[in-house]
Amino acid sequence: MTDDILKKYLKEIPAFLALLRAVEAGFYREIELPDPMLDLGCGDGRFGTLALQHPIRAGIDNEWRVVQEANKRTAYLTVAQGQGARLPFANEYFASAVSNSVLEHIPDIDPALRDLSRVLQSGATFAFCVPSEHFLSFLSVSRVLRRIGLSALARRYETFFNYISRHHHCDSPETWQHRLDIAGFDVERYWYYFSPRALQALEWGHYLGVPALLAKAITRRWIVAPSDANLWLTDKIVRRYFELPLPT
Protein backbone atom coordinates (compact mmCIF):
# COMPACT_ATOMS: atom_id res chain seq x y z
CA MET A 1 0.00 0.00 0.00
CA THR A 2 1.34 3.43 -0.88
CA ASP A 3 -1.46 5.62 0.49
CA ASP A 4 -0.61 8.33 3.02
CA ILE A 5 -1.60 6.68 6.28
CA LEU A 6 -0.59 9.69 8.39
CA LYS A 7 -2.88 11.99 6.43
CA LYS A 8 -5.76 9.54 6.86
CA TYR A 9 -5.28 9.43 10.61
CA LEU A 10 -4.95 13.21 10.94
CA LYS A 11 -8.42 13.52 9.43
CA GLU A 12 -9.93 11.23 12.05
CA ILE A 13 -8.19 11.57 15.43
CA PRO A 14 -6.08 14.08 17.40
CA ALA A 15 -2.63 14.69 15.98
CA PHE A 16 -0.66 13.01 18.77
CA LEU A 17 -2.65 9.81 18.38
CA ALA A 18 -2.50 10.05 14.59
CA LEU A 19 1.30 10.14 14.81
CA LEU A 20 1.48 7.01 16.96
CA ARG A 21 -1.12 5.01 15.04
CA ALA A 22 0.36 5.89 11.65
CA VAL A 23 3.82 4.73 12.74
CA GLU A 24 2.36 1.49 14.09
CA ALA A 25 0.24 0.88 11.00
CA GLY A 26 3.31 0.80 8.79
CA PHE A 27 4.69 -2.24 10.59
CA TYR A 28 1.53 -4.33 10.36
CA ARG A 29 1.43 -3.73 6.64
CA GLU A 30 4.81 -5.45 6.32
CA ILE A 31 3.77 -8.59 8.22
CA GLU A 32 1.94 -11.48 6.59
CA LEU A 33 -1.31 -11.95 8.52
CA PRO A 34 -3.28 -14.82 6.99
CA ASP A 35 -7.03 -15.24 7.32
CA PRO A 36 -8.83 -15.90 9.57
CA MET A 37 -7.41 -13.05 11.65
CA LEU A 38 -8.37 -11.80 15.12
CA ASP A 39 -8.03 -8.18 16.21
CA LEU A 40 -7.65 -8.44 19.99
CA GLY A 41 -8.78 -5.17 21.57
CA CYS A 42 -10.15 -3.74 18.33
CA GLY A 43 -11.60 -0.63 19.98
CA ASP A 44 -13.84 1.35 17.66
CA GLY A 45 -12.37 -0.47 14.65
CA ARG A 46 -10.57 2.54 13.25
CA PHE A 47 -7.11 0.95 13.37
CA GLY A 48 -8.29 -2.23 11.71
CA THR A 49 -10.08 -0.24 9.04
CA LEU A 50 -7.11 1.97 8.16
CA ALA A 51 -4.14 -0.31 8.84
CA LEU A 52 -5.12 -3.92 8.14
CA GLN A 53 -6.21 -5.88 5.10
CA HIS A 54 -9.93 -6.53 4.84
CA PRO A 55 -12.04 -8.35 5.67
CA ILE A 56 -10.91 -9.07 9.23
CA ARG A 57 -12.60 -12.22 10.44
CA ALA A 58 -13.21 -11.01 14.01
CA GLY A 59 -12.56 -8.17 16.40
CA ILE A 60 -13.14 -8.20 20.13
CA ASP A 61 -13.14 -5.53 22.82
CA ASN A 62 -14.40 -5.32 26.39
CA GLU A 63 -16.21 -1.99 25.98
CA TRP A 64 -19.73 -2.20 24.57
CA ARG A 65 -19.72 1.39 23.29
CA VAL A 66 -16.67 0.93 21.07
CA VAL A 67 -17.87 -2.50 19.94
CA GLN A 68 -20.97 -0.78 18.60
CA GLU A 69 -18.79 1.69 16.69
CA ALA A 70 -16.62 -1.08 15.26
CA ASN A 71 -19.73 -2.94 14.12
CA LYS A 72 -20.63 0.03 11.93
CA ARG A 73 -17.40 -0.30 9.96
CA THR A 74 -17.04 -2.63 6.99
CA ALA A 75 -13.60 -3.97 7.91
CA TYR A 76 -14.83 -6.72 10.27
CA LEU A 77 -16.98 -9.72 9.52
CA THR A 78 -17.91 -9.92 13.19
CA VAL A 79 -17.20 -7.88 16.32
CA ALA A 80 -17.78 -9.27 19.80
CA GLN A 81 -17.70 -7.91 23.31
CA GLY A 82 -15.62 -9.98 25.70
CA GLN A 83 -12.64 -10.31 28.00
CA GLY A 84 -9.19 -11.26 26.78
CA ALA A 85 -8.95 -14.12 29.24
CA ARG A 86 -12.25 -15.64 28.06
CA LEU A 87 -12.33 -15.32 24.30
CA PRO A 88 -15.61 -16.55 22.76
CA PHE A 89 -13.91 -18.47 19.96
CA ALA A 90 -13.11 -22.11 19.24
CA ASN A 91 -9.72 -23.67 19.88
CA GLU A 92 -7.15 -23.18 17.09
CA TYR A 93 -9.53 -21.15 14.94
CA PHE A 94 -7.40 -18.15 13.89
CA ALA A 95 -4.38 -18.22 11.58
CA SER A 96 -3.15 -14.84 12.82
CA ALA A 97 -3.86 -12.17 15.42
CA VAL A 98 -2.97 -8.55 16.07
CA SER A 99 -3.26 -6.43 19.19
CA ASN A 100 -2.30 -2.81 18.75
CA SER A 101 -1.49 -0.80 21.89
CA VAL A 102 -3.83 -2.98 23.94
CA LEU A 103 -1.86 -5.44 26.05
CA GLU A 104 -0.37 -2.69 28.22
CA HIS A 105 -3.90 -1.82 29.39
CA ILE A 106 -4.76 -5.31 30.67
CA PRO A 107 -3.88 -5.61 34.39
CA ASP A 108 -3.76 -9.42 34.52
CA ILE A 109 -2.09 -10.05 31.19
CA ASP A 110 -0.98 -13.68 31.55
CA PRO A 111 -4.47 -15.28 31.36
CA ALA A 112 -5.22 -13.16 28.27
CA LEU A 113 -2.07 -14.39 26.53
CA ARG A 114 -2.86 -18.00 27.41
CA ASP A 115 -6.38 -17.77 26.02
CA LEU A 116 -5.13 -16.06 22.88
CA SER A 117 -2.72 -18.97 22.41
CA ARG A 118 -5.68 -21.34 22.74
CA VAL A 119 -7.63 -19.81 19.84
CA LEU A 120 -4.61 -19.58 17.50
CA GLN A 121 -3.59 -22.34 15.14
CA SER A 122 -0.19 -23.95 15.52
CA GLY A 123 2.39 -21.65 13.93
CA ALA A 124 -0.03 -18.70 13.71
CA THR A 125 1.43 -15.19 13.65
CA PHE A 126 0.71 -12.83 16.54
CA ALA A 127 1.84 -9.22 16.01
CA PHE A 128 1.45 -6.52 18.64
CA CYS A 129 2.73 -3.12 19.73
CA VAL A 130 3.22 -2.03 23.34
CA PRO A 131 5.14 0.76 25.11
CA SER A 132 8.61 -0.28 26.21
CA GLU A 133 10.60 0.11 29.41
CA HIS A 134 11.80 3.48 28.06
CA PHE A 135 8.33 5.03 27.89
CA LEU A 136 8.53 6.88 31.21
CA SER A 137 12.22 7.80 31.11
CA PHE A 138 11.79 9.43 27.69
CA LEU A 139 9.10 11.88 28.90
CA SER A 140 10.30 15.47 28.58
CA VAL A 141 8.89 16.80 31.85
CA SER A 142 10.40 14.07 34.00
CA ARG A 143 13.73 14.45 32.19
CA VAL A 144 13.83 18.16 33.05
CA LEU A 145 12.83 17.50 36.65
CA ARG A 146 15.61 14.95 37.06
CA ARG A 147 18.11 17.30 35.44
CA ILE A 148 17.44 19.92 38.12
CA GLY A 149 17.54 17.40 40.95
CA LEU A 150 13.81 16.84 41.50
CA SER A 151 13.78 13.07 41.07
CA ALA A 152 10.87 12.49 43.46
CA LEU A 153 8.71 14.95 41.52
CA ALA A 154 9.81 13.30 38.26
CA ARG A 155 8.58 9.94 39.54
CA ARG A 156 5.26 11.50 40.52
CA TYR A 157 4.90 12.95 37.03
CA GLU A 158 5.65 9.57 35.47
CA THR A 159 3.04 7.94 37.70
CA PHE A 160 0.54 10.61 36.65
CA PHE A 161 1.29 10.19 32.95
CA ASN A 162 1.05 6.43 33.18
CA TYR A 163 -2.31 6.90 34.92
CA ILE A 164 -3.78 9.13 32.21
CA SER A 165 -2.40 6.71 29.61
CA ARG A 166 -4.11 3.84 31.49
CA HIS A 167 -0.94 1.74 31.39
CA HIS A 168 -0.37 -1.30 33.56
CA HIS A 169 2.73 -2.53 31.71
CA CYS A 170 5.68 -0.58 30.28
CA ASP A 171 8.09 -3.46 30.07
CA SER A 172 11.26 -4.60 28.37
CA PRO A 173 11.37 -7.09 25.48
CA GLU A 174 12.86 -9.62 27.91
CA THR A 175 9.83 -9.33 30.20
CA TRP A 176 7.45 -9.77 27.28
CA GLN A 177 9.44 -12.72 25.98
CA HIS A 178 9.12 -14.42 29.37
CA ARG A 179 5.35 -13.89 29.39
CA LEU A 180 4.99 -15.11 25.83
CA ASP A 181 7.13 -18.19 26.44
CA ILE A 182 4.89 -19.21 29.33
CA ALA A 183 1.79 -18.72 27.15
CA GLY A 184 3.22 -20.93 24.40
CA PHE A 185 4.50 -18.34 21.92
CA ASP A 186 7.90 -18.21 20.21
CA VAL A 187 9.26 -14.69 19.73
CA GLU A 188 10.71 -14.27 16.24
CA ARG A 189 11.67 -10.60 16.35
CA TYR A 190 11.01 -7.30 18.07
CA TRP A 191 12.13 -3.70 17.67
CA TYR A 192 11.76 -0.28 19.27
CA TYR A 193 9.70 1.96 17.04
CA PHE A 194 9.17 5.34 18.72
CA SER A 195 12.10 7.73 19.26
CA PRO A 196 12.43 10.01 22.32
CA ARG A 197 11.51 13.03 20.19
CA ALA A 198 8.39 11.34 18.84
CA LEU A 199 7.36 10.26 22.33
CA GLN A 200 7.78 13.80 23.63
CA ALA A 201 5.56 15.04 20.80
CA LEU A 202 3.03 12.44 21.90
CA GLU A 203 3.41 13.59 25.52
CA TRP A 204 2.65 17.24 24.77
CA GLY A 205 -0.06 16.25 22.36
CA HIS A 206 -2.04 14.90 25.31
CA TYR A 207 -2.27 18.43 26.68
CA LEU A 208 -2.58 20.32 23.40
CA GLY A 209 -5.30 17.88 22.30
CA VAL A 210 -7.86 19.11 24.86
CA PRO A 211 -9.78 21.13 22.20
CA ALA A 212 -10.25 17.92 20.21
CA LEU A 213 -11.71 16.31 23.33
CA LEU A 214 -14.22 19.14 23.59
CA ALA A 215 -15.04 18.81 19.89
CA LYS A 216 -15.68 15.09 20.36
CA ALA A 217 -18.02 15.77 23.28
CA ILE A 218 -20.01 18.36 21.33
CA THR A 219 -19.98 17.03 17.75
CA ARG A 220 -19.10 13.34 18.27
CA ARG A 221 -16.16 13.90 15.95
CA TRP A 222 -12.53 14.36 16.91
CA ILE A 223 -11.79 16.53 13.87
CA VAL A 224 -14.53 19.00 12.98
CA ALA A 225 -13.04 20.22 9.67
CA PRO A 226 -10.89 17.40 8.24
CA SER A 227 -9.88 19.12 5.00
CA ASP A 228 -6.33 19.11 3.65
CA ALA A 229 -6.25 22.91 3.87
CA ASN A 230 -7.35 22.96 7.50
CA LEU A 231 -4.83 20.28 8.48
CA TRP A 232 -1.90 21.59 6.41
CA LEU A 233 0.05 23.05 9.33
CA THR A 234 -0.73 20.12 11.62
CA ASP A 235 0.50 17.71 8.96
CA LYS A 236 3.71 19.70 8.49
CA ILE A 237 4.47 19.67 12.22
CA VAL A 238 3.59 16.04 12.87
CA ARG A 239 5.21 14.59 9.75
CA ARG A 240 8.71 15.50 10.92
CA TYR A 241 8.23 13.07 13.82
CA PHE A 242 6.52 10.48 11.65
CA GLU A 243 9.56 10.36 9.37
CA LEU A 244 12.16 9.98 12.13
CA PRO A 245 14.33 6.84 11.83
CA LEU A 246 13.70 3.92 14.16
CA PRO A 247 15.48 4.19 17.51
CA THR A 248 18.38 1.83 18.10
PLM region spans:
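Conserved N-terminal segment of class I S-adenosyl-L-methionine
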Residues: 1-86, 90, 96-98, 113, ...
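Active-site acidic short loop of glycosyltransferases
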Residues: 34, 91-92, 108, 122
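A generic structural signal for alpha->beta connector loops
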Residues: 54-56, 76, 123, 184-187
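Residue-level "edge-of-site" marker
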Residues: 83, 102, 193-194
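Active-site micro-motifs of SAM-dependent methyltransferase domains
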Residues: 86, 104, 133
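Conserved functional loop/turn residues at catalytic and ligand-binding sites
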Residues: 88, 93, 105, 184
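A short SAM/SAH-binding and catalytic strip from SAM-dependent methyltransferases
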Residues: 98-107
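S-adenosyl-L-methionine-dependent methyltransferase catalytic module, highlighting the catalytic core
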Residues: 107-115, 125-248
